[in-house]
């Protein structure tokens, strides 16, 4: 855990210390009965001693369409590492360094102070902001940030990223996006929705809707495209959707299973699962030429599925029952050599590689309950991250510090998040229905 002020400098080292037949069936069952709803953050577990921080209402913030300082406070609170002071308890409201009375903040037990001022400009807004160490009475960070007329939430998330990195040594991920699938319910014709939102669930944007199930959304690394599975052709087919132009293109529609798309690091290829030749196998599709490369070759009783690229793009990590039960394997694309990676437990599936390429997260079954687990690839050491049940679809934040996953809460599907060290947890519950299949975006290039 990262605890309190004295531990923040060590944050970096401590925090960074598709579908098979069975998974497809599970996801389709769980997808039933979902309803549209906004996402609301609910922190379920934070650091034992979160660092007290005050984000003072920014000068010029009044009358703006977004409360920038409140968004920053919510971002930092959601990390679980910080506890923001309420403006109602503040003794003063400085917006520039000369106005800071450090005594006011020591009285409140505040370790760090964030202040700023927002002014309108010809092109939008300009914020000048700073981070201050209360005990040492010194400035730690000072920047000027400009955004367009609709960029106030982006401004807030960027400031949160800067503050988080300054205090933990880890790049923030508050400015990133998420994808997820939701179901409006059987009374709505086009009930299945692919949604894009900010990492905090705000600014939902409908990408695509269909009367047939949608599965496995996957971001391209340049954030301009999404690949996903749609059943609109009466069988699973893989589509790509351009987020800039809105254009959709069907990439596969082979007989049998077409599923689990995963973009290569350079976005030129998709790893995917096809059963056109019999049993489900891993293939690579060259998007420009449409050439197919078969990666795995097994007999008819074997299911190879849920591919995920290694960080260097030289291998594929995937789920297979070739050993009898679902386990995670890695295949080298140059050699074709297959290596088993998981040995603990009788069910490990849906692998996702961490950004540093050193570990992976997965769905792990223990005592008949599905949890999210982390494993060091080299040593094989595994730890269970979640205490919820029927957990699935893990997706890792681009800084490797947190992951999103789908789970059950109060008899409905929700999205939840957990830190890689399992010390921080929060939930993004739906107010009305269920949401599934999260995909956390990479960083913007």
UniProtKB/Swiss-Prot annotation:
Coiled-coil residue spans = none
InterPro entries referenced in this protein's UniProt entry, alphabetically: 6-blade_b-propeller_TolB-like (IPR011042), PD40 (IPR011659), Tol-Pal_TolB (IPR014167), TolB_N (IPR007195)
Identify the keywords attached in UniProt to this record, alphabetized: Cell cycle, Cell division, Periplasm, Signal
GO cellular component: a single term? periplasmic space
Subunit structure, as described in the record? The Tol-Pal system is composed of five core proteins: the inner membrane proteins TolA, TolQ and TolR, the periplasmic protein TolB and the outer membrane protein Pal. They form a network linking the inner and outer membranes and the peptidoglycan layer.
- Please name the NCBIfam families in this protein's record: propeller_TolB
- Protein name per UniProt: Tol-Pal system protein TolB
């Amino acid at each position: 855990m990262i605890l309190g002020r004295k531990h923040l400098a060590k944050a970096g080292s401590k925090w960074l210390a598709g579908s098979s037949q069975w998974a497809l069936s599970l996801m389709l069952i769980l997808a039933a009965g979902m309803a549209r709803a906004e996402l609301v953050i609910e922190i379920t577990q934070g650091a034992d001693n979160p660092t007290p921080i005050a984000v003072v209402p920014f000068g010029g913030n009044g009358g703006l369409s977004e409360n920038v300082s409140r968004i920053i406070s919510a971002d930092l609170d959601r990390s679980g590492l910080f506890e923001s002071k309420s403006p109602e308890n503040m003794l003063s409201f400085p917006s520039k360094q000369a106005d800071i009375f450090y005594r006011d903040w020591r009285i409140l037990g505040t370790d760090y102070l964030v202040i700023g001022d927002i002014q309108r400009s010809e092109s939008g807004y300009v914020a000048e902001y700073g981070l201050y160490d209360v005990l040492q009475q010194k400035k730690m960070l000072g920047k000027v940030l400009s955004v367009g007329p609709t960029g106030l939430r982006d401004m807030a998330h960027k400031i949160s990223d800067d503050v988080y990195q300054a205090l933990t040594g880890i790049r923030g991920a508050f400015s990133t996006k998420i994808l997820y699938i939701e179901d409006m319910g059987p009374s709505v014709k086009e009930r299945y929705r692919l949604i894009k939102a900010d990492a905090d669930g705000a600014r939902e944007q409908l990408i695509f809707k269909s009367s047939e199930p949608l599965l496995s959304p996957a971001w391209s690394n340049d954030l301009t495209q999404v690949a996903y599975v749609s059943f609109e052709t009466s069988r699973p087919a893989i589509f790509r959707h351009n987020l800039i132009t809105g254009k959709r293109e069907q990439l596969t529609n082979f007989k049998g299973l077409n599923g689990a798309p995963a973009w290569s690091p350079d976005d030129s290829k998709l790893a995917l699962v096809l059963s056109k030749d019999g049993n489900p196998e891993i293939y690579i599709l060259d998007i420009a030429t449409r050439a197919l490369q078969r990666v795995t070759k097994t007999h008819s009783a074997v299911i190879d599925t849920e591919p995920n690229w290694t960080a260097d793009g030289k291998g594929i990590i995937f789920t297979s029952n070739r050993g009898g039960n679902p386990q995670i394997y890695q295949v080298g694309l140059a050699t074709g050599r297959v290596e088993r990676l998981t040995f603990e437990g009788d069910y490990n599936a849906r692998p996702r590689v961490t950004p540093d390429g050193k570990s992976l997260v997965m769905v792990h079954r223990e005592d008949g309950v599905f949890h999210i687990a982390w494993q060091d690839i080299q040593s094989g050491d595994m730890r269970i991250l979640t205490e919820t049940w029927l957990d699935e679809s893990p997706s890792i934040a681009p800084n490797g510090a947190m992951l999103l996953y789908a789970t059950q809460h109060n008899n409905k599907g929700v999205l939840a998040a957990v830190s890689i060290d399992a010390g921080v947890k929060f939930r993004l519950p739906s107010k009305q229905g269920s949401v599934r299949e999260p995909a956390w975006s990479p960083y913007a290039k």
